[in-house]
């Protein structure tokens, strides 16, 4: 463990790349406005039961693909499979591939788990009532720290996981970025289709997960792990021989 920490410290000191200009204030402003617009225009119709049965069935068929459990298991498998392979193989190329797989699993794990912890803390702190309680409480009812799942709607934990997972893959495979972002939007909105969340919950969750994956990628790029930084300081995937 000491050798790992020492290696990471050396990588951090060696990484002299500058941080990207994130313009987080602008992005936060856009996200907040998207949430408010969704709350005003979309949350009411969703809460009043304006979702067709066919759409609900579609949502139920797809929504579990965004569950954190299996994504964490797959990520952990990549991490430990890469680590185990690294310990037994001798070929330099194979070791580099194993190291890449190991760090990919670690990146996905940190992005999904830590963003999920934040989302769950926010859900319990805010305590927004879910759509199932719309008739009794409307769209703006809050019961912080109630300990009841029916009052843990904002932000969507599923959407946070989905946002983190697909944002991570967008950064790892930038050529497929549009496809991954479309998948994130569709899977996130299945939470609305099944009546578990309002659209504003999903928008906030997707944004939280996506931004968290970007932050983790920036940290990894500064250490030279899995990512490198481009001329503007943004994380881009490293080629295998650069790992």
Give the location of each predicted region:
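Interfacial segments of alpha-helical transmembrane regions
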Residues: 86-120
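Membrane-interfacial segments
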Residues: 50, 82-93, 122-130, 134, ...
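N-terminal transmembrane-helix/juxtamembrane module of multi-pass inner/ER membrane proteins
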Residues: 1-80, 124-126, 130-146, 243
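Small-polar-interrupted transmembrane alpha-helices in polytopic inner-membrane proteins
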Residues: 39, 110-124, 179-191
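Alpha-helical membrane-inserting segments
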Residues: 43, 118, 122, 212-220
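Alpha-helical transmembrane spans of integral membrane proteins, capturing the lipid-embedded, hydrophobic core
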Residues: 29, 33, 108-116, 206, ...
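Membrane-embedded catalytic cores of phosphoryl/pyrophosphoryl-handling enzymes
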Residues: 13-20, 84-85, 137-243
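Alpha-helical transmembrane segments of integral membrane proteins
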Residues: 24-28, 99-111, 176-179, 204
């Amino acid at each position: 463990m000491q050798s790992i920490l020492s290696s990471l410290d050396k990588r951090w000191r060696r990484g002299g790349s500058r941080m990207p200009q994130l313009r987080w204030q602008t992005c936060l402003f856009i996200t907040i406005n998207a949430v408010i617009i969704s709350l005003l225009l979309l949350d009411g119709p969703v809460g009043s039961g304006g979702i067709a049965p066919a759409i609900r069935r579609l949502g139920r068929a797809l929504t579990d693909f965004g569950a954190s459990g299996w994504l964490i298991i797959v990520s952990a498998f990549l991490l430990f499979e890469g680590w185990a392979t690294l310990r037994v193989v001798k070929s330099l190329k194979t070791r580099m591939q194993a190291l890449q797989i190991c760090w990919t699993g670690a990146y996905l794990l940190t992005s999904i788990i830590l963003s999920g912890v934040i989302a769950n803390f926010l859900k319990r702190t805010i305590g927004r009532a879910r759509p199932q309680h719309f008739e009794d409480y409307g769209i703006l009812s809050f019961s912080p720290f109630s300990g009841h799942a029916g009052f843990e709607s904002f932000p969507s934990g599923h959407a946070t996981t989905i946002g983190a997972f697909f944002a991570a893959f967008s950064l790892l495979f930038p050529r497929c970025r549009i496809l991954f972002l479309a998948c994130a939007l569709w899977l996130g909105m299945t939470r609305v289709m099944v009546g578990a969340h309002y659209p504003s919950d999903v928008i906030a969750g997707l944004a939280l997960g996506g931004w968290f994956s970007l932050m983790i990628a920036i940290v990894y790029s500064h250490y030279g792990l899995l990512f490198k930084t481009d001329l503007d300081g943004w994380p881009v995937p490293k080629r295998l021989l650069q790992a």
